[in-house]
């Protein structure tokens, strides 16, 4: 998107940090106005993270104006806030490509710009990395500053407090800027949020009181101040630049600032994305999960639903309103969410942890040590399994099958449609011997009608098509693509349904009848469902060629789900071509 100089006269001049610093302080309010307007114009066309960036315009301008970035280290936590930062650091005319294939990365990305010090996507990482950078800067002796902008709920995660606990005893030259907009993606909850509200209220009533939880961690606490007052921010940052101790600056902002609909409903406007047609009756997998949860809760008061700050995205909004005493939003605290569920299970309750695949990685030890080792019946509803698309490598849910499959006693189910997802959720809910997983993709189902709940026999697959010579074993939501490829190849197609326990009886039968086996999954091949098939075949000394189709040993960049599937040959034509190429070797 090109600049219209008449529409953005100041911003068109200050298209780089070097030129930004040539502006007078008096010109900065107009720059902020134009930057906000430009962000509105661009994101309304291109889609992407929206409300968070609007809330940090003044903070971004002031930081780059006062500090010597990129010599000084500026870290963003979470990366949703970084759109204004990208615009001011030489990427303004490319901002329209953000989240698109071969376009700008959706979050700060080290390979994209020298101003992006730390690649981010998950929350609460900046203070740890910032402390390391600050210690290194101190040893360097060049008076290099390190600033971490922490917002959108990132301060609620345990990792942030682990870092602050460490930073408080080291006393490095580190500035933590707390962007307090009272929101993550959903509304912030918890005791910390109440403490921040207490500090905001005290500031309104008295200037004498100046104690906070951060001072007890040996941080110099400053604030709270208005995060939209550009002149005050310049004044404050000029002072903090000269400090030689660990500081936390508390700034009050409004998520969605400058666009009234986003100010009034920052959850809805957190991201602007393509909407499904209002006339479409096809449910998303998240919708199916949410409705199933409500249906179970109608007759079971012991079912407890847990989410780490992803209520809306996981389809739990209706449940949270209808069953508030059975709903727990633990904030951005994935480790706590899992062990909290373990405690509920020990007490005889039926916990369901709803979590995105990419965020479950953060609680891996808890899954093993606190749930699986103790054989606790915790159901994990893993949303966004597989390719998620536009949010890129930090959010692709492609590692879960590999890191979960090796855990003893766990049941892993991969539905191929929304009705199968519903039945698997019920099967996991009824399973009492240990943890169970239902792993489903982002987006809509295929239009299957939902049938009454019933148990699926553990480890039992379904034959979807009978063909010759080739048997395709599909795990998960790529079944439709696999079916089209199987038709072209006249291959047998099996909906495996379970990654663990694997339907080994079916594999044995297929090995006696077919010349080739092909496995398909929407995840990394290494250690995944296909690897489980390979291991079984080798253990039984079966001499049968097997082709594993999935994602390669690399991080998958951003783009639409369809583009990525095409690029990695997971669409029908790609699957067919990959099999034909393999057969021709």
Swiss-Prot record:
Q: Which GO terms describe its molecular function?
A: 1-deoxy-D-xylulose-5-phosphate synthase activity; magnesium ion binding; thiamine pyrophosphate binding
Q: Give Gene Ontology CC terms.
A: cytosol
Cofactors required = Mg(2+); thiamine diphosphate
What pathway does the annotation place this protein in? Metabolic intermediate biosynthesis; 1-deoxy-D-xylulose 5-phosphate biosynthesis; 1-deoxy-D-xylulose 5-phosphate from D-glyceraldehyde 3-phosphate and pyruvate: step 1/1
- The Enzyme Commission number assigned here is 2.2.1.7
The reaction(s) catalysed by this protein are: D-glyceraldehyde 3-phosphate + pyruvate + H(+) = 1-deoxy-D-xylulose 5-phosphate + CO2
- Organism domain of life: Bacteria
| A Pfam family reported for this protein in Swiss-Prot or TrEMBL | Transketolase_C
Looking at the keywords, is Magnesium present? yes
An example of a Gene Ontology BP annotation on this entry? thiamine biosynthetic process
UniProt binding sites for thiamine diphosphate: 80, 121-123, 153-154, 181, 259, 334
Q: Indicate whether Ligase appears among the record's keywords.
A: no
Cofactor comment in the record?
Answer: Binds 1 Mg(2+) ion per subunit.
InterPro entries associated with the record: Dxylulose-5-P_synthase, THDP-binding, Transketo_C/PFOR_II, Transketolase-like_Pyr-bd, Transketolase_BS, Transketolase_C
Question: Where on this chain does Mg(2+) bind?
Answer: 152, 181
Q: Which UniProt keywords apply?
A: Isoprene biosynthesis, Magnesium, Metal-binding, Thiamine biosynthesis, Thiamine pyrophosphate, Transferase
Q: What is the protein's known function?
A: Catalyzes the acyloin condensation reaction between C atoms 2 and 3 of pyruvate and glyceraldehyde 3-phosphate to yield 1-deoxy-D-xylulose-5-phosphate (DXP).
Q: How does it assemble?
A: Homodimer.
Q: Which family does it belong to?
A: Belongs to the transketolase family. DXPS subfamily.
Q: What is this protein called?
A: 1-deoxy-D-xylulose-5-phosphate synthase
Annotated organism of origin: Buchnera aphidicola subsp. Schizaphis graminum (strain Sg)
